[in-house]
Regions:
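C-terminal regions of RecA-like/P-loop NTPase motor modules
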Residues: 21, 43, 63-80, 97-99, ...
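Conserved H-loop
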Residues: 4-6, 128-131
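Cytosolic-facing regulatory segments adjacent to core modules
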Residues: 1-79, 147, 192-193
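Flexible glycine-/small-residue-rich
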Residues: 3, 54-56, 87, 179-181, ...
Length: 240
């Protein structure tokens, strides 16, 4: 996990709250015996390694990340399965110097291309984030044109989705995910779906299927017939 925004310790607190099932504001007050017990129980379920590395905002680019991966491999024999970068727009570019006379479209596009190149080179998925424009910030139906600063970013990404929150969804402790671009599959399949969110524990979780029924896309609505064990599509009655 590479962060250019929050401190390493704050990122670790969020992950601890998720794994230990404790409200994030209670992490520092958790009694040591309870902490040890939860860590022991967690270790029995799963094993893994997480490296959190902080860089100053707008100071690190793909070259720094490549050097970090090489350093971890040589000194700790550590090779990640996935890389999270928080977040793309505040990375630097290895091709453009900071303060150079370059527009935001070209600069952000260059960062996206460099990170994608790093992903291809290392054969690792890289997940990052961006923000929306002001008009997209309050929108309940975000699309690719709402990407802030540079449309070159969605042009470069392989998979892109939006996290959408409204007052109604907040009341249900849910967040909507909308596929904006998908090079690996048909983006109209499960184009919109909701997941549960527990902000106090920094956790996402699956929702019941009934929660998905209200957001099915037109033309994609399907009804599952349990008796016949088949999917009946809403356009089944069409005649050719």
């Amino acid at each position: 996990y590479i962060t250019l925004e929050m401190a390493e310790e704050k990122i670790a607190e969020r992950i601890d709250a998720n794994l230990l099932n404790v409200n994030i504001q209670d992490i520092t007050d958790l009694p040591k015996p309870m902490f040890d017990s939860r860590v022991t129980n967690l270790a029995q379920k799963t094993q893994g390694s997480l490296i959190i590395k902080e860089y100053p905002t707008a100071s690190a680019h793909s070259g720094h990340f490549r050097a970090l991966l090489q350093d971890l491999f040589l000194k700790k024999s550590f090779t990640p399965d996935i890389i999270f970068i928080d977040y793309l727009n505040i990375c630097a570019s290895s091709r453009y110097k900071a303060g150079s006379n370059v527009n935001s479209y070209s600069y952000i596009k260059a960062i996206a291309e460099e990170l994608r190149g790093l992903a291809v080179e290392t054969n690792l998925p890289i997940v990052s984030a961006t923000q929306t424009t002001r008009s997209g910030f309050g929108s309940s139906d975000v699309d690719l044109t709402d990407t802030s600063e540079s449309f070159g970013l969605p042009a470069t990404a392989d998979l892109m989705f939006a996290l959408i929150s409204t007052e109604e969804l907040e009341g249900l402790n849910q967040i909507m995910v909308k596929q904006l671009k998908n090079r690996y599959n048909d983006p109209t399949i499960n184009k919109r779906f909701v997941v549960g969110i527990d902000r106090s524990k920094m956790r996402l979780y699956d929702c019941e299927q009934s929660a998905q029924n209200d957001i099915l896309d037109n033309g994609q609505e399907e009804e599952y017939n349990a008796d016949e064990k088949k999917l009946k599509k809403s356009f089944e009655g069409f005649k050719y």
